[in-house]
Amino acid sequence: MGKIIGIDLGTTNSCVSVMEGGEPKVIANVEGNRTTPSVVAFADNDERLVGMIAKRQAVTNPERTVYAAKRLIGRKFTDAEVQRSQEVSPFDIVEGISGSVAIQVEGHKYRPAEISAMVLGKMKQTAEEYLGEEVTEAVVTVPAYFNDSQRQATKDAGKIAGLDVKRIINEPTAASLAYGLDKKVEEKIAVFDLGGGTFDVSVLEIGDGVFEVKSTNGDTFLGGEDFDMRIVHWLADEFKREQGIDLRSDKMALQRLKEEAEKAKMELSTTVETDINLPFITADASGPKHLNIKLSRSKFETLVEDLVERTVGPCKTALKDAGLSASQIDEVILVGGMSRMPMVQKKVVEIFGKEPHKGVNPDEVVAIGAAIQGGVLQGDVKDVLLLDVTPLSLGIETLGGVTTKLIEKNTTVPTKKSQVFSTAADNQPAVSIHVLQGEREMAEGNKTIGRFELADIPTAPRGVPQIEVTFDLDANGILNVSAKDMGTGKEQSIKITASSGLTDEEIDRMTKDAELHADEDKKRKELVEARNSADGLIHSTEKTLKDLGDKVDAETKENVEKEIANVKTALEGDDVEAIKAAIEALTAASHKLAELMYQQASQETPGDGDAGAAGAKKKDDDDVVDADYEEVK
């Protein structure tokens, strides 16, 4: 049985971990980094680039470089958050099938789940290269405040990437696993998770292997991306004021601003001022323009003050829902790159009245927790019980547009709840079940996550038919709903699918597409390796010919030069087999050169060397010179 890996699928960066010898290990990627940018780019030759290689070329290829796809996953195009992303994104965010979100690159529409699948595929590949075996199962983390649609879309992304997602686990819960695995003393902890795109806070009771989530809250559209954009807009406004040019209208300039903003933000966590220097950012009739400006930590804090303040409400709500005061929290665990910002840490102290615990790596702790959960599922990690909760209430729309909740928020999962409803009109032949998620009293204020119909209800006065609606919420936080006519026994059910609208057929198509590109990547790698081998062989063979000079007979030299020319011709094309065949032919032709080299080496070594030494000795005997030595005392 293969390993179950743990993947933190982040907005900005992703991380993969695995249990080895009872300990979680974060796996470094091919570049040697322990986190990988969640960036996907499409090159000119239809090549897909994922990770740091994609991020590096973003400035020259902004319209075909996709980042922060996690912020779009499981959403509808009309969502306010999607519209906000569309305004500042250098790549095209468009409407997809059934009102879903799509990312358009060169006429092709990609779903956010498809982009996320490419990132998951990269993490899968990183794990496989380290483990030396195929990986097919994973635990993938999501923000605790992700709704049903977003969770389902994340699971779909795993499937497209060729992974059976054994469990979707909340990021703060994963962090608590990593923090408290060996803790025997009971503690009440708060996990404050401010990442690249989302904010979560969870309150847990942990101790002796039991991790019980008491409450969770958050904001799925608050994170480092928003902090970056505040700097981007400030830089653009300052440049416009000085030069009269709005850099936001130039996608390449916008991408350069974004990269520099992210760098400045990170630097300001450890320094009080940073220089932002972007030469040749644009040009007009008078010539090239340069951007050179200083940004102080205090100015940055002024720009993002309201963003930091937005973390307060969810923290207070989470404490209230858990029935605890801030003073009853024993430890506050910081998770996510943005938690390094001094202003954020100061706000945490204000909220909880204590210094946060800094003993975990905020970039890796979630992936480590996911690997531990993988170990639990695999049976490698014993005596760990994880009791997570649903972040939002679930219910159905009833008469008058009211939301009737069947499962309240912060209910421990998995859970199953049933309630009996009836018809609203006489002789009503069918009932429409409108499934909702959210905390508002009226249906229109909550998120629709599914609709289905129970038909063929026998004619009867209103209020007489008995319709039992059952909500079954699994450990991943994914919902199944059924409705049953108690009179006839007729039943209708629905597995809630993401608002991304991915059907099984679409997932299969995307999976095949991902596999096809994996094969293409493999072939491309094989071609590169063959080219490198050919170049190396040409270089060494030409050097040998030159070194041997006249010692090579004309026939051998002509034969070798002919094969070198054949390899060079093969290198002009992309046929791997042709290059390999040419390499073999040149290697065979070079054997004669190797023999000559060996003969030459034989003539110059030990036997001749000894004779030379003897001769030298004789000469020494003929010309002996006595040296005068003075003894130094």
UniProtKB/Swiss-Prot annotation:
UniProt GO molecular function: ATP binding; ATP-dependent protein folding chaperone; unfolded protein binding
Pfam families reported for this sequence: HSP70
Composition-biased stretches (Acidic residues): 622-633
Gene3D superfamilies listed in its UniProt record: 1.20.1270.10, 3.30.420.40, Actin, Chain A, domain 4, Substrate Binding Domain Of DNAk, Chain A, domain 1
Entry keyword annotation includes Flavoprotein: no
Induction of expression: By stress conditions e.g. heat shock.
Region called Disordered, residue ranges: 599-633
Residues recorded with modification Phosphothreonine: T198
Cited CDD domains: ASKHA_NBD_HSP70_DnaK-like
Swiss-Prot/TrEMBL keywords: ATP-binding, Chaperone, Nucleotide-binding, Phosphoprotein, Stress response
Function recorded in the entry: Acts as a chaperone.
Family that this chain belongs to: Belongs to the heat shock protein 70 family.
Stated name of the protein: Chaperone protein DnaK
Organism per entry: Desulfotalea psychrophila (strain LSv54 / DSM 12343)
Organismal lineage: Bacteria, Pseudomonadati, Thermodesulfobacteriota, Desulfobulbia, Desulfobulbales
Gene name of the record: dnaK
